[in-house]
Amino acid sequence: TSDRRYRFNYHAVNALLARVYSYAGDSTNAIASAEEVIKKSGLELSSNNQDDPILFSECICALYKHHLTEALSQFWADGDKYTTQYFIRSERFNKYFEVSGNLKEDMRTKTAAFYEHSSTKTALSRKYSINSQEAIPLIRLPEMYYILAENTSDLTKAAKYLNAVRNKRGYSRSVNVQFTNAATQQAALDKEFRKEFYAEGQYWYFLKRHGITALSYDNAVTLTQERFEFPLPDAEKEYGWTASHDATR
């Protein structure tokens, strides 16, 4: 409801369970939890991101950040000649979001979602520059569909869950994806995770849990183990940590 805002409630618990069960390889419980959220949370997939590029209308729970816009403006809005902002080069943008020429069916690539700077050939996400909620999504509804798409053994049915999100985002049914095997299933999920959760962090976890070492849109990047491990804080080293602990991680 509107009263709860984006606090961690019953539906958020089920959404988190769906995520954890999926991570653990427990498809039965992952499916049950994801279906519970889709059927009973009252949220629906959106086909319009105008004035809501991060799609709070689909947000199950979020982390509040006081004065978020001001705190992040140098990265997502203001800045001196693109020296501080987290922009993406147009060439990589087109590969990342599968944009061909001027063809932009996907609303996640349009001007409501990205500001494109033609002279520098860069694009900048609007997710944190247009953010009246001052919140960072932790779990959004599309992830529940992706969990169903990943954990449903019937590949035809699994593809329908992925296409449900794609169709809402602007893709016509004529370009619906199909899964012929586990490899094509994962490849399609890879593409949708990176498009849907750009600048939200979820794609990093997708890459990590699937052990993906190469990016399909950037051959120059190799995902080594170091890219998936956060540096140990110095404070933890002061309280008994030794190098031998690495062997148990």
Which sequence ranges carry the predicted segments?
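Acidic/polar-rich alpha-helix caps and helix-coil junctions
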Residues: 1-91, 98-249
